[in-house]
């Protein structure tokens, strides 16, 4: 009787009836992929893109403080007091300034604002100021206020810069005039003055009487004497002469003295700096909207918690670091190995080697079990939470590592300072390249660590179960354990939560192990006997065949003869 089918049936019956618990991890239908240092497009259950690419497309209030749009006035026209910009004179506070690159009202009289780029940079760090009169025009003595058709007010009347006074002769006299401004405000004060350079000596005499006038400006730390430079220059607004406007930031307690006998554009109004802070002067045609943002660029506001952005380098506020990469994905889940549908007797249950499970809820790692009550699955929340905490720490570490003190200054310089602009561009490009490379390398490294961490977590959970069960189960090597005793759902819970009582099931497990080992030994013995019988029969058949073949050969060659006697 062949006993092999009976042995196989017994083994199958043992496997089917055995209770089992498996350690595994989550698998999803996610299509997310990340890059690591060693691999590209690694499937993961979840990831986040660290680079923000969306913006509002508008100017917004920054942290609740509104910006100020200078309207038809340029920065220079506003700061010196172009009479066409009187609507801006009441400006006191802003989060940032917006300047139309093609604003028609700049310096109405031909000339320039000295160190314009530096003054713009200064105002990028000012959040509020107040306009105040420094020296009354009537206190200078026997001179008249000048006006020009180049600087008309809103009514079309000849006027001049509202923050300066252009003194010309009174009658046929222009005496030496002198005044001192003392800064007693307790704050920094912006003081402006200027010089008018006539077309010719004749024009100089007609305006100031003196043919070679001078202007002397002195403080406690420096003094400079200016002479008028006559000559015809390219002009506009009907003027061919030229004005140069200067400025200085006076600290509390400092004083400045002006002395002149012709050509002085004297200070009248200045600005008391009320509050310093980070600001910017943006130049773009986008509109102001009723919105709030944490980060503003010249193309729109950025409201995000992401670590990086690739919208614009010249950003203001609580902004993500600018990098050139359009996408940097950080793995926040596990390596996504699809579940294997055909897993023999245990169906969907499998270990960390074969693949993940699609049924885990509220967890990345967990257990599946099979017993008389059915099949169940449960997440291990503690190990999952630890992994989530580690990933949160990774994200925070990336933010901390990428925080720097570098700020772009590219947007603060006018066309005059082209060499500074070129240098600023090169510095910005170099720094951005470094930031972009560091960011990508950091994310690739963290992705490697994250995926390795998840593999280690599953193996640690597997080892924890193995130590808990000890000799009460057989480790199948694929993440599953065949229990050598009956284990209901309550028993399975104790294995999962670490309260399993090994001694309680030790005797039953010992007997079960002996039974299994006995069946295996008997099976092996029967197999050996069967093999011996088959070997003997096969050898006999071969021997008989050889003898018959020899006899037939001998007879056919005449060497063998049979005599039959009756």
UniProtKB/Swiss-Prot annotation:
GO terms (molecular function) for this protein are: host cell surface receptor binding
Q: Where is this site: Cleavage?
A: 343-344
Q: Give the subcellular location.
A: Virion membrane; Host apical cell membrane
| Pfam families named among the record's database cross-references | Hemagglutinin
Keywords attached to this Swiss-Prot or TrEMBL record, sorted alphabetically, are: Clathrin- and caveolin-independent endocytosis of virus by host, Clathrin-mediated endocytosis of virus by host, Disulfide bond, Fusion of virus membrane with host endosomal membrane, Fusion of virus membrane with host membrane, Glycoprotein, Hemagglutinin, Host cell membrane, Host membrane, Host-virus interaction, Lipoprotein, Membrane, Palmitate, Signal, Transmembrane, Transmembrane helix, Viral attachment to host cell, Viral envelope protein, Viral penetration into host cytoplasm, Virion, Virus endocytosis by host, Virus entry into host cell
| Extra information | Major glycoprotein, comprises over 80% of the envelope proteins present in virus particle. The extent of infection into host organism is determined by HA. Influenza viruses bud from the apical surface of polarized epithelial cells (e.g. bronchial epithelial cells) into lumen of lungs and are therefore usually pneumotropic. The reason is that HA is cleaved by tryptase clara which is restricted to lungs. However, HAs of H5 and H7 pantropic avian viruses subtypes can be cleaved by furin and subtilisin-type enzymes, allowing the virus to grow in other organs than lungs.
Annotated function? Binds to sialic acid-containing receptors on the cell surface, bringing about the attachment of the virus particle to the cell. This attachment induces virion internalization of about two third of the virus particles through clathrin-dependent endocytosis and about one third through a clathrin- and caveolin-independent pathway. Plays a major role in the determination of host range restriction and virulence. Class I viral fusion protein. Binds to sialic acid-containing receptors on the cell surface, bringing about the attachment of the virus particle to the cell. This attachment induces virion internalization either through clathrin-dependent endocytosis or through clathrin- and caveolin-independent pathway. Plays a major role in the determination of host range restriction and virulence. Class I viral fusion protein. Responsible for penetration of the virus into the cell cytoplasm by mediating the fusion of the membrane of the endocytosed virus particle with the endosomal membrane.
Its protein name is: Hemagglutinin
Q: What is the lineage of its organism?
A: Viruses, Riboviria, Orthornavirae, Negarnaviricota, Polyploviricotina
């Amino acid at each position: 009787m062949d006993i092999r089918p009976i042995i196989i049936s017994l083994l199958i019956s043992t496997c089917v009836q055995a209770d089992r618990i498996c350690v595994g991890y989550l698998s999803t239908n996610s299509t997310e992929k990340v890059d690591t240092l060693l691999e590209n497009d690694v499937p993961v259950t979840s990831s986040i893109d660290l680079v923000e690419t969306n913006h509002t497309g508008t100017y917004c209030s920054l942290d609740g403080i509104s910006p100020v749009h200078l309207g038809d006035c340029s920065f220079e026209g506003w700061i010196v007091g172009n009479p066409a910009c009187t609507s801006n004179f009441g400006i006191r506070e802003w989060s940032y300034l917006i300047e139309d690159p093609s604003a028609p009202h700049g310096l109405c009289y031909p000339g320039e604002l000295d160190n314009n780029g530096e003054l713009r940079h200064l105002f990028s760090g000012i959040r509020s100021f107040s306009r105040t009169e420094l020296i009354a025009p009537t206190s200078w003595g026997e001179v008249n206020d000048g006006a020009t058709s180049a600087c008309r007010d809103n009514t079309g009347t000849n006027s001049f810069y509202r923050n300066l006074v252009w003194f010309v002769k009174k009658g046929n006299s222009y005496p030496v005039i002198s005044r001192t401004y003392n800064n007693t405000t307790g704050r920094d004060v912006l003081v402006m003055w200027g010089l008018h350079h006539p077309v010719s000596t004749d024009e100089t005499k007609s305006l100031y009487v003196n043919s070679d006038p001078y202007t002397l400006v002195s403080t406690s730390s420096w003094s400079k004497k200016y002479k008028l430079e006559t000559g015809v220059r390219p002009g506009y607004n009907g003027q061919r002469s030229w004005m140069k406007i200067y400025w200085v930031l006076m600290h509390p307690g400092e004083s400045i003295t002006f002395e002149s006998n012709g050509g002085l554009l004297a200070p009248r109004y200045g600005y008391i700096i009320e509050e310093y802070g980070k600001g910017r002067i943006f130049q773009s045609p986008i509109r102001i909207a009723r919105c709030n943002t944490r980060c503003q660029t010249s193309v729109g506001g950025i409201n995000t918690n992401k670590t990086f952005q690739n919208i614009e380098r010249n950003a203001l506020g609580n902004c993500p670091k600018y990098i050139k990469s359009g996408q940097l994905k950080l793995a926040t889940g596990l390596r996504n190995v699809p579940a294997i549908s055909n897993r023999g007797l245990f169906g969907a249950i499998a270990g960390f080697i074969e693949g993940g499970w699609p049924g885990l809820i509220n967890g990345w790692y967990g257990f599946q079990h099979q017993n008389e009550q059915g099949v169940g699955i449960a997440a291990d929340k503690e190990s999952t939470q630890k992994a989530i905490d580690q990933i949160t720490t990774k994200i925070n570490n990336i933010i901390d590592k990428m925080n720097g003190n570098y700020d772009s200054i590219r947007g603060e310089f006018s066309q005059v300072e082209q060499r500074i602009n070129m240098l600023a561009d090169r510095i910005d490009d170099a720094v951005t390249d470094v930031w972009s490379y560091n960011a990508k390398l950091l994310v690739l490294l963290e992705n490697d660590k994250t995926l390795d961490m998840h593999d280690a977590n599953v193996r640690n959970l597997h080892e924890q179960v193995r130590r808990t069960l000890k000799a009460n189960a057989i480790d199948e090597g694929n993440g599953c354990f065949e229990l050598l005793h009956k284990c209901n759902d309550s028993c399975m819970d104790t294995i999962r939560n670490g309260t399993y009582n090994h001694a309680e099931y030790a005797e039953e497990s010992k007997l079960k192990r002996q039974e299994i080992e006995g069946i295996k030994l008997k099976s092996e013995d029967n197999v050996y006997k069967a093999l011996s019988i088959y070997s003997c029969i096969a050898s006999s058949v071969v021997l008989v065949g050889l003898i018959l073949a020899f006899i037939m050969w001998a007879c056919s060659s005449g060497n063998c003869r049979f005599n039959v006697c009756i």
